[in-house]
């Protein structure tokens, strides 16, 4: 990884840390929007630990935000925390209407998580 790429990742993680601290202290609407936008950047940069931590705090502030919950679950899956991800995704998929794009994403991630649990299981009988 180049020094520039490493610096970019450090900057992303720094932004996530700063926003997480603001969320813990009670964030403004602008800070909530910035944190929500940063989730996608963290996912795209494959920074799943920072993504999960920021999504945890953002979920506390906006518990009904399906996009945040889905990205949180995706970060959990990427870190191998499959049953935790399933526990986030099942109620999310159940409460969203069938035509909602986040419902389709949540259902797809559920399938991915269950498939990984199956492949991780020693006895497949």
Task: Label each region the model flagged.
Residues 1-10, 14-17, 26-40, 62-78, ...:
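Amphipathic alpha-helical repeat scaffolds of TPR domains
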């Amino acid at each position: 990884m180049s020094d520039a790429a490493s610096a970019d990742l450090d900057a992303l993680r720094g932004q996530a840390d700063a926003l997480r601290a603001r969320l813990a202290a009670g964030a403004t609407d602008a800070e909530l929007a910035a944190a929500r936008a940063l989730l996608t950047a963290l996912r795209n940069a494959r920074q799943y630990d920072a993504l999960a931590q920021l999504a945890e705090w953002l979920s506390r502030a906006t518990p009904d935000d399906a996009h945040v919950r889905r990205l949180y679950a995706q970060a959990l899956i990427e870190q191998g925390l499959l049953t935790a991800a399933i526990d986030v995704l099942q109620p999310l998929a159940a409460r969203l209407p069938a035509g909602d794009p986040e419902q389709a994403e949540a259902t797809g991630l559920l399938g991915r998580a269950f498939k990984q649990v199956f492949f991780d299981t020693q006895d497949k009988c």
